[in-house]
């Protein structure tokens, strides 16, 4: 009888709001494991790539981003474990690159898989870094939309812009060195595309009896 009461009480406790083990949804649990595992993959990949960096500028970018991602990983892991606001706020990533993109295509050698470790250079390292950051940015975006815990949702969504910034920093490095070239359309096509949209005019028409206004505060 006592065992039955304990089981019944345990089942009742599972439905009580505010219980630490019950403020995460099922999808959220799986997605958070993907997010945190993905972050570890980025950090591990950066650590493995570091030994091959030849350009000090790229090495500085790698180290700066690794340090930032580590700090945000700790915040995310803490928030997920406690289900509450983390002890530290999410940070803003400040890149060092200027925002000047070089447009146009220049002749370059076709890309192909490396045949030995000696073929690894800064262009390959920066490409691997960019792919890792882009993939994690996508994961954060998709996962944040599945979060039921408001603290975890805010922590994830706050990091998306920072990953965009880190990806842009790596792109600018690649672009400056000719590793990532940016083609452009001719002037006429660009002008036509820029003028393909016009501002929206007016507001939605009211529904009969003003029912569309009910419940809006």
From Swiss-Prot:
Residues 1-28 are annotated as: Disordered. It comes from the Bacteria. Belongs to the CotF family. One of its GO terms (biological process) is sporulation resulting in formation of a cellular spore. This is Spore coat protein F-like protein YhcQ. InterPro entries: Ferritin-like, Spore_coat_CotF-like. Residues 1-11 have a biased composition (Low complexity). Pfam families: Coat_F (PF07875). PANTHER family: SPORE COAT PROTEIN F-LIKE PROTEIN YHCQ. Its main location: other. It is found in: Spore coat. Keywords: Sporulation. Disulfide bonds: none annotated.
């Amino acid at each position: 009888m006592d065992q039955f009461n304990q089981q019944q009480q345990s089942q009742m406790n599972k439905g009580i709001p505010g219980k630490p083990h019950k403020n995460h949804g099922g999808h959220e649990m799986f997605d958070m494991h993907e997010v945190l595992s993905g972050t570890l993959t980025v950090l591990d990949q950066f650590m493995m790539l570091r030994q091959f960096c030849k350009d000090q500028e790229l090495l500085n970018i790698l180290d700066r981003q690794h340090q930032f991602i580590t700090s945000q990983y700790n915040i995310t892991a803490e928030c997920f474990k406690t289900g509450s606001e983390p002890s530290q706020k999410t940070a803003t990533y400040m890149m060092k690159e200027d925002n000047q993109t070089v447009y146009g295509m220049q002749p370059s050698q076709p890309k192909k898989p490396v045949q030995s470790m000696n073929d690894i250079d800064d262009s390959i390292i920066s490409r691997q870094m960019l792919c890792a950051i882009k993939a994690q940015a996508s994961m954060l975006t998709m996962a944040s939309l599945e979060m039921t815990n408001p603290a975890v949702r805010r922590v994830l969504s706050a990091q998306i812009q920072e990953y965009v910034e880190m990806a842009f920093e790596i792109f600018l490095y690649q672009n400056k060195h000719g590793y990532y070239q940016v083609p452009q359309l001719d002037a006429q096509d660009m002008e036509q595309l820029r003028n393909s949209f016009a501002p929206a005019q007016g507001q939605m028409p009211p529904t009969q009896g003003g029912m569309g206004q009910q419940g809006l505060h």
